[in-house]
Amino acid sequence: MDPKRLLIFRAVARAGSISGAARDLGWTQPAVSQHLRALERSVGCALLLRGAGGVELTEPGRVLLVRADALAVQLHMAEEELADLSALRRGRVRLAAYPSAAATLVPRAIAGLRSRHPDIDVELTEAEPPEALDLLNAGDVDLAVVFSYGDDPVDTPGLRWTPLAGEPVALVVGADHAAGRRKRLTLRDLADEPWIVGCARCRAHTLLLCADAGFEPRVRHISDDYVVVQNLVAVGLGVTLLPRSALEAYRHPDVTVREHASFGTRTYGIVHREGAEQVPATAALVRELSA
């Protein structure tokens, strides 16, 4: 049953005549009659009795009019809901972000979005990049903030990756560590130190840098939590490399931070499925994250 023809039938029933419905719809009378005949053929019975004074509903016509009224109500509700979504009067965005972004970039973006569009809800899930991409591919989130090192580009088949900015990676040692007082410092100088590493991508970056410096680090501790990592460093249990955003999110008072171009940079950005940028609420959050 064609919904369009069902709504035309409803217009005729409400107007009481084919000519009246044609005027209401802005159609020609023959076009309305043609759709009515096609609808009656599809249901296999007469829906209207035509007469000089207009039309009269048959019993099947009265039954069908109830359904046609319900369809019209549902379509009107859909139009209103879509209008609200388009105007950002309502909406929801499910966002995944790695820990340091979730502590710095994301709160600012959500606050900015809320100030402009208070009826948009953002649901945040903390996830490292591989897990965030899995969530995207599974349809469990709409948007992800992820990072990539130059030696480990974001692999996003079927997804759109938009880099936002780069951030330096810093060496972090205890405040009383001799390396923190050196004017010139290389990773090679720390070849004999115990190392603390983080997530898989960060760990791979550290191992690659150390290999380029001519040694394999003695990894003693593994943690994705930059607070845990800095506390371990602060009490002399190892040294580590951390991106600037992790140090902006939390800076232990008993660590020394040294930045150098040789420690590399990390690029962060936004990933989403193709077409998601056309969803109003998602597009609004992307703008805030990119600001």
Say what each PLM segment does:
Residues 40-57:
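A short LG(V/I)-centered, amphipathic sequence patch enriched
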Residues 42-43, 64-86, 147:
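Alpha-helical linker/hinge and terminal dimerization helices associated
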Residues 90-153:
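Central regulatory/effector-binding core of bacterial HTH transcription factors
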Residues 154-162, 167, 227-275:
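Beta-alpha-beta core module
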Residues 156-169, 173-195:
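Flexible hinge/capping segments at coil-to-helix
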